Amino acid sequence: MPPKRKASKNSVRGRKRRTRTNNLPLNPEVKEETVVSSTHRQTRSQSKKPSLSSSAEPPSESLDDNISALNSLQRSASSSEKGSDEDNEKLGSSEDDEFDDDFDTWEQVDLSPNKQEDKKDLHIVTQHITPQLTKESKKGSSSAMDKSIRLSIHIMHFTCLLYHGSVRNRWLMNSLLLDGLRDLLVEKQPSVVEAWVCSSQTHEDLLKLLNGLRMWWNKSFKIESHGLRKLGYRTLKQGFDIGFSPEIFHNFHEYQASLLSLKGSRDLAAQGFTALCRSLNLKARLIFSLQPLTFSTASYDDWSPHILPEETSTSIDDDLRYPIFWTEIYDQSEKKWIAVDAVVLNGVYTNDMTWFEPKGAYAESKHLRMGIVAAYDNDLYAKDVTLRYTDYQSSRLKKIRHVSFADKYFDFYKAIFGQLAKRNKDAEDIYEEKELESKVPIREPKSFADFKNHPEFVLIRHLRREEALLPNAKPVKTATFGNGKKATSEEVYLRKDVVICKTPENYHKEGRVIKEGEQPRKMVKARAVTISRKREHEFRVAETNEPVLQGLYSSDQTELYVPPPIKDGIIPKNGYGNMDCFVESMIPKGAAHLPYRGIAKIAKKLNIDYADAVTGFEFRKHRAIPVTTGIIVPEESAQMVYEEFLECEKIRIEKQQMKERKIIYGQWKHLLNALRIRKRIEEQYA
């Protein structure tokens, strides 16, 4: 008796069940309920996403659209029923075994509504959807998505404001603008300029000059427009009408015209005062107290009507009692920076800079917070000088600058300012950085995890493979972790006592060698990159049954490698017939490096001793391939080899050009012949 075959997927039992599922009666009430629930789900999902639209229209759903939605729901239910049928068929039954391939295809089920149901009235329930930019929820409840969105907005807004200040600072260095302001100052205040030029330019003379400029600029500049103002997060229901027109310049010419006319916003007035000081060859900075939207989901940074300018005010923006822009002047005699504000505070500040920090409930109501202060130099660089104007320990500053990243010691603002920082720093910059860093308190680690990557303290267990302690390093304290019998104590060292160590091979690539008699700072397991080195290590491990160790040395244990000078025009070579030339100092005295491709055959042709210059290695397929760049030849023969190389290159280029010219002529000849043939065919057979 032949064995019974398993029931196929197209069995009658499975097919009948599918048919019953797909032929559910299309009850209008059921359809109405289904559409409404799907609409509600869509509303909930859309309300979580920010929308760029200021108004929302109610969704208009046609009859066909809702029927299609219902059919899709039925098909999904059918597919889920199909999965359960397949599971039942795998179990097998005597009833299904009687049917095998009688039905090779499924019955086509019509999912469209039948005629009887079309005659019934279908009621479509719609609901007004109001998308929001920010979720209106109870205080203290915020999702991870809201926090992520606000953090992205904070980073983007901070970057845009920083770039805005950089553009304005670049405009303030325009020579036409500086000449115009200087001429205006000489015309209106000749005595102030003359007194400064004729003085010895001491600290008192500088203060006298700044006070004179401040008073004249404050009286002469007319505030006619609004400056920067942080409005906070708004919902779409609140709209996009901010209630006032801010000052906008489309190009530098509009900016220059407004500044020379002494009319504009208080931000423009503060920027113009910086340019005025620069026109007198003073080392002046443009200071910008950035006011980005915060990354916190708390309600204190949401929009409120109190943020807008007061309509009853007699002067524009006088409700903002603290400046956004001001000026710093470097005092050469005192070696320090002086802060000057000629618009809002209208004063000169030499020591106490906290006058610029917004304080009190009124400043909070206007969303004025000092968290990021940027200083733009004459040379178009920028740096963070926040610590000069505010207390790093204040809770207000921590709320603004404490951005959480995977690395809790990563300073996002420092990384961004690093892109605008000066590369070649002078003594003044170094002294200022040390002064500002001295105001940053060191956060004391309290747990085992706090010691990892801590900028001040370190545990021995947290040292990397290439890090080691100096021999004279001493523990500054002892940290205890755990409680009771599980408590352990470890010695804590200073991070400055940790040095970076390297192998002798790595130092050789830098042109340095280990000093005689130096002992390694650390012994670590040797690494093998190439196949030959791996085999060597495996052979040594098999012989000694111990891992291969390698010594690491710090930079103070090395000295510059000085190769022996060449003698009698003979270039010394290594075992591979070339010479290591990783840095310029590795070229021996009496030799010259000619880093030109193909120059080796010229030296060989002239019968001059040479060696290929190895300048690096490429690692491919577990093999170290040396990279050669030119040759090393005796110094007295270098000029002759170079001139012969130029002559050969000239001949080679001429031959290459002749070859290319011949190819081009051949292509033109082929094209002209084709055109002649085409013309003859058209004349004969057209």
Curated annotation (Swiss-Prot):
It is found in: Nucleus. Residues 1-101 are annotated as: Disordered. GO terms for cellular component: cytoplasm; nucleolus; nucleotide-excision repair factor 2 complex; XPC complex. Residues 48-61 have a biased composition (Low complexity). Keywords: DNA damage, DNA repair, DNA-binding, Nucleus. Residues 68-81 have a biased composition (Polar residues). Residues 1-20 have a biased composition (Basic residues). GO terms for biological process: mismatch repair; nucleotide-excision repair. Residues 82-93 have a biased composition (Basic and acidic residues). InterPro entries: BHD_2, DNA_repair_Rad4, DNA_repair_Rad4-like, Papain-like_cys_pep_sf, Rad4/PNGase_transGLS-fold, Rad4_beta-hairpin_dom1, Rad4_beta-hairpin_dom3, Rad4_BHD3_sf. GO terms for molecular function: damaged DNA binding; single-stranded DNA binding. It holds the Pfam family BHD_3. The keyword Glycosyltransferase does not apply. Has a role in the nucleotide excision repair (NER) pathway. Acts in both transcription-coupled repair (TCR) which removes damage from the transcribed strand of active genes and in global genome repair (GGR) which removes damage in untranscribed DNA. Involved in the repair of short-patch mismatch during meiosis. This is DNA repair protein rhp42. It comes from Schizosaccharomyces pombe (strain 972 / ATCC 24843). The gene is rhp42.
